Design a protein with these regions (language model features):
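Catalytic core of nucleotide-sugar-dependent glycosyltransferases
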Residues: 195-198, 204-229
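Membrane-proximal basic amphipathic "stem/tether" segments
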Residues: 219-250
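Nucleotide-sugar donor-binding/catalytic module of glycosyltransferases
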Residues: 1-207
C-alpha cells in the first residue's frame, strides 16, 4: 500500500489551519502522515498543530521562503507520494487520498492532478473553464495544474530537483514543467481541494509579481527559436493587458 505525505506550510495561519487539519485527518485512507513546516508563527498556529491527531511531524522557525519550506517538508517526510496543502487550503471530501491512491495503483503515473474550487469568504466557486487534455506545449501556454490538487511520487519529485528556491510565486509551475519532461501526468477532471482567496495569500496579494514570475518561468522552459519566442511574448502581452483591468482584492 502506498504511503502519502501531506505537507502543510504555515505562518500565522490560525484563522484557517483547523479546517486544513480536519480535512486531512478525516481521510479514510490509512497510510497518511501530515507534515507541518512553520515559518515562525506568533499566533495560535503551533498550538493547534500540536493538538493534531494521527501521524504528524512538525518543524518550526523555518526561514528562506516558501520554496525552501516546501523542500524542507519533503526532506522531513517519508511517504511514497508527496502532496502540498497549505495552511489556508483544505480537501473537499474524505475520499480524496483513497481516490488518488487508486489511480496510482492502477497506472504507471509518476504524478497526477485534479481540480480545485476557490473559497472566497467561505463560499466555494468552481472555475468556468474545462480542464484541458495535458500536453507540454499546452502547459507552456499557461499553468492549469493547481498545486493543492497535485500529487507526485517521491522518486519523481527528487529526480526533478524539487522547488527552485529562487522563485516566490511560480515554483509549482516550474516544477510541473520539469516533471512533464520526465513523465506526463494523469489529469483527473474531479474536484479535490479548495484554495482560499484572501488578501493575505501571497498569490492574491501580489498578483502582478506572480504574473511576471510565471512569464519568466515560461521563458525558461519554452523551445528555442524565433517563432516560439514571438508566440509566447504575444500571449504575455495579451494576458498582462487583461490583468491590468482586474480589480484588486482588499
Amino acid at each position: 500500500m502506498l504511503s502519502f505525505s501531506i505537507i502543510t506550510c504555515t505562518w500565522n495561519s490560525e484563522p484557517f489551519i483547523a479546517r486544513c487539519i480536519e480535512s486531512v485527518a478525516s481521510q479514510t485512507y490509512p497510510q497518511i502522515e501530515h507534515v507541518f513546516v512553520d515559518g515562525g508563527s506568533e499566533d495560535g498556529t503551533l498550538e493547534r498543530i500540536k493538538r493534531t491527531p494521527g501521524n504528524i511531524k512538525y518543524v518550526t522557525d523555518v526561514r528562506g521562503g516558501i520554496s525552501n519550506a516546501m523542500n524542507v517538508g519533503v526532506e522531513l517526510s517519508s511517504g511514497d507520494v508527496i502532496a502540498h496543502l497549505h495552511g489556508d487550503d483544505y480537501y473537499l471530501h474524505d475520499q480524496v487520498i483513497a481516490r488518488v491512491a487508486g489511480v496510482f495503483d492502477s497506472s504507471n503515473a509518476q504524478w497526477l492532478y485534479g481540480r480545485i474550487v476557490s473559497d472566497l469568504a467561505g463560499e466555494q466557486f468552481k472555475p468556468d473553464w474545462q480542464l484541458p487534455e495535458f500536453s507540454l506545449s499546452r502547459l507552456l501556454r499557461g499553468n492549469f495544474i493547481a498545486h493543492p490538487a497535485a500529487f507526485v511520487r517521491r522518486e519523481a519529485f527528487l529526480r526533478s530537483g524539487g522547488f527552485d528556491c529562487g522563485l516566490k510565486y511560480a515554483m509549482d509551475y516550474d516544477l510541473w514543467l520539469r516533471l512533464a519532461k520526465i513523465s506526463p501526468p494523469v489529469g483527473l477532471d474531479e474536484y479535490f481541494s479548495a484554495f482560499r482567496r484572501h488578501a493575505g495569500s501571497a498569490s492574491t496579494a501580489n498578483a502582478f509579481a506572480a504574473f511576471e514570475e510565471d512569464h519568466s518561468v515560461r521563458r525558461r522552459h519554452r523551445p528555442a527559436g524565433l517563432v516560439p519566442q514571438l508566440f509566447h511574448e504575444a500571449i504575455y502581452q495579451y494576458r498582462r493587458a487583461r490583468l491590468g483591468q482586474l480589480p484588486r482584492m482588499r
